[in-house]
Amino acid sequence: NYERRWKVSWFLRESNAMVPAAIAPRLSLDNQPDDFNGKSILVIAEQGVGDQIMFSSILPDLVSRASKVTFVSVPKPMALFKASFPTVDFIPPLPSLRIGAFDKVIALGSLAYAFRNRLEDFPGAPYLRPRDDVIEAWKARLGPKTTRLRVGLSWQGGTDRTSGQKRSI
């Protein structure tokens, strides 16, 4: 139920493994774009890496309004995020994180409520940019570019709790 996602109690119950208990009371889920104007925002990655990559497409919308955006993420996607969104501060989950230093604390997936309500709200443009050294390493590994399309896929979906093995290739 898409609408139910924005109810705080349901959200906290469903994401309790990813949202630290100290942060949960500060979460703001039902924001409008203007609610972020000139504010310092702490974004919590409350979902798996695949969803973080998908919802990170909303970060430029948030950055355009907020005075400062700090994103708490697991280390795995952090290098890609730092290269793609250079004006966002990315930090790993820290037990000593001072959430009181931020005007708002929001779950990454909840940004969709503020910024993605209609098809027209999706920019339809690339938003992930690998680092130059990563591009060069892959060029060296794959060899000269040919006319044939080269595609590689790898995906692991979900967790044991969400039947992830059924959603992986």
PLM feature segments, named:
Residues 1-169:
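Alpha-helical solenoid repeat scaffolds of the TPR/TPR-like class and their adjacent stem/linker regions
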